[in-house]
Amino acid sequence: MRIVYMGTPEFAVKPLAKLISHHEVALVVTKPDAAAGRGKKVISSPVKLFAQENHLRVITPLKFNEEVYQEILAVKPEVIVVAAYGKLLPREILNIPPYGCLNIHASLLPFYRGAAPIERCLMAGEKETGITIMFMDEGLDTGDIALQEKVAINQEITGGELRKILAEIGADLIIEALKRLREGGLPRVPQDHQLATYAPPLKKEDEIIHWADSAEKIRNQIRALNPVPGAYTVFRGKKIKIWKAKVGEFSGKKPGEIIFADRKNGFLVATGERGLQILELQPEGGKKMSWESFLNGYRPLVGETFEC
């Protein structure tokens, strides 16, 4: 099929790679280059870089105006495929392809509609998630469901690891969806909007560890935000990102207070419920390190506290 593909982050690269080996991708639409990092270096999206490497035509519109509409119309797509593009499509664009627009969404809709379904489901401690292929409408992930595939969530998995798994599944599922779409056998099941939950974009405050929360909630926050953007706390006036932790058995101390900091008992910090065993962390301006290396270098004392 002749396809216009819309996507931006790394999650959207795997489906695009799969599509170009099975279909004709006539045009790729992605977000414009943007400044990122401390040096504010201008970088291209992963989808743009992949498309250029594979000699695909790419456009990076700031908004959907008449010029963009005409560019998409000119390639005569049979279907538009979207994966984490980052913008809602106006009706004029949705109405261009005769087979409609399909979205690859990283949750089991109607749950976790929105921009950050992977992080939000991990932060909530969900045991299951998946991929949904849906027919797009003008709403935020409100269209009819075509296909879904469930994935059990290992309680140690990180956001980055889950994203890779879901990208692979999404790539396979969109190929199956397009095959059935062309054959006339792709289902359309309306969502139960009363069951809808939402996954809003991550904010800076989502990165802050609140030690009054339970150890399980903090552990879920840490793994959800690994590797980007990371969850952090403050120790001796400086930020420290915590990359890996597990729930411990100790409780009864002030939240944030160091309970143990030795090789026998590990690095245990009190929370609002139980203790949090810190396994891997990264001081501001430094490299990731094990808890043992942190103890050797910083010598934290029992009774010292991590700030919220």
From Swiss-Prot:
Top-level enzyme category: transferase
Transmembrane is among the record's keywords: no
Cross-referenced InterPro entries: Fmt, Formyl_trans_C, Formyl_trans_C_sf, Formyl_transf_N, Formyl_transf_N_sf, Formyl_transferase-like_C_sf, GART_AS, Met-tRNA-FMT_C
List of residues binding (6S)-5,6,7,8-tetrahydrofolate: S107, L108, L109, P110
Keywords for the protein's UniProt record, in alphabetical order: Protein biosynthesis, Transferase
PROSITE patterns tied to this protein: GART (PS00373)
GO molecular function: methionyl-tRNA formyltransferase activity
Protein name per its UniProtKB record: Methionyl-tRNA formyltransferase
